[in-house]
């Protein structure tokens, strides 16, 4: 599905929320979109693994990692799960690792940065709740569009 976030904003200005420009694209898929599913975690990626092990059905996993720059929440193994289980992408308000490998995968991955340290694994966090960062609230079931120009969120499909 081809789109450009700039065009979506122009055509739907009153229907979209634009995320502050804070993310870097790491995945092999530069543009991606889908229904939102969310996680709220802090320096623990256990729930990220659980989510990506499930059927993605073209959805986008939005991970509110509290903006932590102290460890990675997604690495190449979890990204590969995302590819295998048909997720469109992952947006991490935090860090990823294995960025070179992730860059070769057919998965959209946006994050604040890259960090070599893995996270803890205690299973702590929340699933499918509204999370807010970058000036936008991400609500499960709403839609997200991401490309080289940025990230746009809407309550209903724009395509």
From Swiss-Prot:
The keyword Lyase appears for this protein: yes
Keyword Transcription annotated: no
EC numbers on record: 4.1.3.17, 4.1.1.112
NCBIfam families attached to this UniProt entry: NOT-MenG, PRK09372.1
Residues that bind substrate: 75-78, 97
Keyword tags: Lyase, Metal-binding
GO molecular function: 4-hydroxy-4-methyl-2-oxoglutarate aldolase activity; metal ion binding; oxaloacetate decarboxylase activity; ribonuclease inhibitor activity
Organism name: Aromatoleum aromaticum (strain DSM 19018 / LMG 30748 / EbN1)
Gene3D superfamilies: Ribonuclease E inhibitor RraA/RraA-like
Entry's cofactor comment: Divalent metal cation.
Role this protein plays: Catalyzes the aldol cleavage of 4-hydroxy-4-methyl-2-oxoglutarate (HMG) into 2 molecules of pyruvate. Also contains a secondary oxaloacetate (OAA) decarboxylase activity due to the common pyruvate enolate transition state formed following C-C bond cleavage in the retro-aldol and decarboxylation reactions.
Biological-process GO terms, alphabetical: regulation of RNA metabolic process
Enzyme class (EC, first level): lyase
Name used for this protein in its record: Putative 4-hydroxy-4-methyl-2-oxoglutarate aldolase
Quaternary structure and interacting proteins, as annotated: Homotrimer.
Cofactor: a divalent metal cation
Binding positions (a divalent metal cation): 98
Family per similarity comment: Belongs to the class II aldolase/RraA-like family.
Entry superkingdom: Bacteria
Catalytic activity annotation: 4-hydroxy-4-methyl-2-oxoglutarate = 2 pyruvate; oxaloacetate + H(+) = pyruvate + CO2
